[in-house]
Swiss-Prot record:
InterPro entries: Fumarylacetoacetase-like_C, Fumarylacetoacetase_C_sf
Residues spanning the signal sequence: none
Ligand binding (a divalent metal cation): E69, E71, D100
Domain of life of the organism encoding this protein: Archaea
An example Gene Ontology molecular-function term: metal ion binding
Name of the protein in question: Uncharacterized protein PYRAB13970
Source taxonomy: Archaea, Methanobacteriati, Methanobacteriota, Thermococci, Thermococcales
Key words, A-Z: Metal-binding
Pfam families: FAA_hydrolase
Assigned protein family: Belongs to the FAH family.
Length: 225
């Protein structure tokens, strides 16, 4: 169970689903070899991929290239279906940081074959979250610095104002397709600079006004008995 500080207590992170955005920062779309999309590109990550702050990301043996992606995450506060953009903030509980860890080689292989690429996003430990949840009333998410360091060196740096599709648009779009339940998480996309992780790496990911999410990285082979 993951419990994150929230208001004067703690919040149990128990989503029915994690909805993530692909290519929601134009420069990231281009570094992936694509043009910015004309409508949101969404995919799902399993809740079983979640881990809390100061935990361990495990690099699976099946992948030779695992990348980091830092994202501003939205926590849904109440049931949402067909929500218009102008009312979207009424359905938000708060904000946190989520790392969309990705097995890039498996993703590329799936894309080449025309397959869905859930395999690249769904490994255990591939959705670190934290370090806390900030009440929506305490943070304007429209223009925040977002970044990530590996071993003290900056890899990713951007601002949430660079999102192609803003949070209200995302909630309107997603809730027109599927019902959002309390606790569901929307990971809003990543700025450019994604890159590989290796055994022993230390990650510091931040979003202005939320804090720093710290994780360590180990190879699966190093923990097998």
């Amino acid at each position: 169970m993951i419990r994150l500080p929230f208001r004067d207590g703690y919040y149990e992170v128990r989503p029915t689903k994690i909805i993530a955005l692909a290519k929601n920062y134009a420069e990231h779309a281009r570094e992936m070899g694509s043009e910015p999309p004309e409508e949101p590109v969404i995919f799902l990550k399993p809740p079983s991929a979640l881990i809390g702050p100061n935990s361990v990301i495990v690099l699976p043996r099946r992948s030779k290239r695992v990348d980091h992606e830092v994202e501003l995450a939205v926590i849904i506060g109440k049931r949402a279906k067909n929500v218009p953009a102008e009312k979207a903030f009424d359905y938000i509980l708060g904000y946190t940081i989520l790392l969309d860890i990705t097995a890039r080689d498996l993703q590329a292989e799936a894309r080449k074959k025309g397959y869905p690429w859930t395999v690249s996003k769904g490994f255990d430990t591939f959705a670190p979250i934290g370090p806390r949840i900030v009440d929506k009333r305490e943070l304007d998410p429209s223009d925040l610095e977002i970044g990530l360091k590996v071993n003290g060196k900056v890899r990713q740096l951007g601002r949430t104002s660079e999102m192609i599709f803003k949070i209200p648009e995302l909630i309107e779009y997603i809730s027109s397709i599927m019902t959002l339940e309390p606790g569901d998480i929307i990971a809003t996309g990543t700025p450019p600079g994604v890159g590989p992780l290796r055994h022993g790496d230390k990650i510091e990911a931040w979003v202005e006004g939320i804090g720093v999410l710290e994780e360590e990285v180990i190879a699966e082979d190093s923990i097998l008995c």
